[in-house]
Amino acid sequence: MNTEMTNEHYTIQEKLHILADAAKYDVACTSSGSSRRGQKGELGNAVSCGICHSFAADGRCISLLKILMTNHCVYDCKYCINRASNDVKRATFTPEEICNLTVEFYKRNYIEGLFLSSGILKNPTYTMEKMCEILLLLRTKYHFNGYIHVKTIPGASDELLAAAGYLADRVSVNLELPTSEGLRKLAPNKTMQTILSPMGKVQNTIAAHRMAIGKSSYMERSRGNQFLHNGIFSDTSKQQFQKKLESRAALQRGTDVSKTSAQSNPALLDSSFTWNQAYQLAPHDMSRLKRSFAPAGQSTQMIIGATGESDYTLLQTTQQLYQGFDLKRVFYSAYIPLNEDPVLPEIGTPPPLLREHRLYQADWLLRFYGFQADELLTIEKPNFNELLDPKCDWALRHLELFPVEVETASYAELLRVPGVGPKSASRIVNARRYGRMDFTSLKKMGVVLKRAHYFITCGGKQMYHTPLEETYITRQLVSVDRKESWKMAHANEGFSQMTLADFGIG
């Protein structure tokens, strides 16, 4: 049952306690991706705010004021603490209240930006209208130039989606679950179509705006990606992806995003608005701000452990989202059982934090290391070995490619060695132009030798005489990572996400 109370029953401090606590399950641990610096006569700086220097013990970023506009919700998603059928305290901020909180907290150096989300108040369009009012007040009346990440509401009108894109640095639509079946099971008020449609509109508008100012239609990626010809952002992979979409066009309707991207869906393409259309949709008092459209791109979030989807399904969905919608980030949130329901894990079940960690590592391999999802997992092996990081797991299944000689290997080959990252691989490639290397110099370059020495040679020699045998190396690597894995799996014991009360507020 809903506990409905009007705003006069709560003070600002009480609302803050309720709505900041209700927002903690939204993931926002990322740099802003925006390079807009402070300007004379305006408040805030989008450059410094997104550095993510403050994290809670569970990895969530606390540099943003992460808050809900309201936790009233007409939807009844089974996994959500704010679902309509739950008996919880309900509160709603007015636009002015959120603006005042944001500005005052920024002046006191508590926060460096705003992460704004909301439950569904009345209907999606009404809710999104109120959220856009908040953003417009911050940018115009309060001259707030800091970083803003807004969660858009699926089902809201195109005009409001365009307004949010102009006013915020990053916009996102939570996918929540990777399959239509999962959504039908746990979120009966949502459909894959209503989620992917605004995602496609935002992507097309970002691309159109970037081309209008002389940039590539695709978001900027790590500079190292230009050397990864097999990576998911390479021209070859993009062409292969488009061919797959074309071949599946006839079977598109009614399929899951994990099988194909909605970008090839004619319904989505027809409803996507162009840059000029978005500009015309923007209110006149907003369009004169001459802002970029979502300069930090868009992101999404998927819940881990609420349903039975495998890591393979999640990772395939992730790759399709990156390639089909040019997302800047995909976030994963280990499900914390909060509601009693026969289709959900029992209350008290530990959240799969280590699994979440492995998915983030795999996501990193897709974005920076040139891996494809089907290289890391297959239908026959659909889940990661939680005792090993995904890169080590892949290397152990492909020992025929090792050892790699560091003095002759390409940048792409070095990146596939456990313990070698983009920075250390780049340093190796640059250093070997000036002389020979040894394992001491590799360590100084940042190579993690406790993992890498099993898979590399330097000058034709191994660091130690170790057998290139899967069982032996697996046992050694599991022993090395055991302490880290235990800490990750038990990260929620004795710790919790920092709240405003930790700063003496609320």
Name the predicted role of every residue range.
Residues I67-E96:
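Canonical Radical SAM [4Fe-4S] cluster-binding loop centered on the CxxxCxxC motif
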Residues K66-L68, E96-K107, D285-M286:
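Short, charged beta->alpha transition segments
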Residues M1-H72, V448, I456, Y464-E493, ...:
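Flexible, acidic/Gly-rich N-terminal and inter-domain linker regions that tether
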Residues V103-S117, A362:
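Short Fe-S-cluster ligation motifs
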Residues C99, K122-Y369, E375:
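Conserved AdoMet/S-adenosylmethionine-binding subsite of the radical SAM
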Residues V343-L415, R451-G506:
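Long, highly charged, low-complexity intrinsically disordered interaction regions
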Residues L64, C77, L116, V173, ...:
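Conserved, mostly hydrophobic/aromatic
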